[in-house]
Amino acid sequence: MSILEKITSSPSECAEHITNKDSCLSKKIQKELTSFLQKKETLGCDSESCVITHPAVKAYAQQKGLDLSKELETRFKAPGPRNNTGLLTNFNIDETLQRWAIKYTKFFNCPFSMMDFESIHYKFNQVDMAKVYKGEELQYVEGKAVKRPCNTFGCVLNTDFSTGPGKHWVAIFVDMRGDCWSIEYFNSAGNSPPGPVIRWMERVKQQLLKIHHTVKTLAVTNIRHQRSQTECGPYSLFYIRARLDNVSYTHFISTRITDENMYKFRTHLFRIA
């Protein structure tokens, strides 16, 4: 079985909570834009996201008072480098995690952080994980601030400082399901967690030990999965997604996942246009 078959995502450009994959659009918007959708080839489009971002369609929607931006934000996957190896931005990452938080209602999506989070006020360093579990910590889902009990937590960090352009994306996943909880660090290049992350993991462990009897920290770094210069972002998101879909962390310490898998995974992450 391919590693991509172990997760529940697909190459459809629809956001994953949309069950009807024949169309990502709401019925109202489908009806209003029928003529455009039926002749999308004449617009130079091969997808619904292309149609609703076309200038002519946007102008028509504005005249009709249709909110196409809401359709894009809530019913489609995030924009991003789907069919090329462009480097992922923090927007690509955070917008993807926000959409996953709609599908996984017990997932806490934390905004990205740079590695100087101990001195810069990133959300990542302010979260109390016990409050995440109890539903006392604010998160943003579908553009709204909500509080809800979460038994999983995910964040993507960059190994550069805030003053730099960015170096390498890594993943944090906290699993508060089952009997033994875990605080996990994944680096596709196989490098060990730096000091700030080690301190963060230990602090979170102490938070969780106040409400649960068994908590461990894990550095999932014994295999160098990534050989390219471009796929650290997809690897980091893939780790979080695989763990949400109950793929064990042990898979990542026993089996190398190739860059070719990440090229394919990009089509699972982002919409077509």
Curated annotation (Swiss-Prot):
It comes from the Viruses. The active site is at H168, N187, C232. GO terms for molecular function: cysteine-type endopeptidase activity. It is an enzyme of class 3 (hydrolase). It is found in: Host cytoplasm; Virion. The keyword Protease applies. Its EC number is 3.4.22.-. GO terms for cellular component: host cell cytoplasm; virion component. It holds the Pfam family Peptidase_C48. Cysteine protease that plays several role during infection including processing of the structural polyprotein or inhibition of the host immune response. Catalyzes the maturation of the pp220 and pp62 polyprotein precursors into core-shell proteins. Plays a role in the disruption of host pyroptosis via specific cleavage of gasdermin D/GSDMD. In addition, strongly decreases the host cGAS-STING signaling by targeting IKBKE via its enzymatic activity. Also impairs host FOXJ1-mediated antiviral effect via degradation of FOXJ1. Belongs to the peptidase C63 family. This is Cysteine protease S273R. It comes from African swine fever virus (isolate Tick/Malawi/Lil 20-1/1983). The lineage of its organism: Viruses, Varidnaviria, Bamfordvirae, Nucleocytoviricota, Pokkesviricetes.
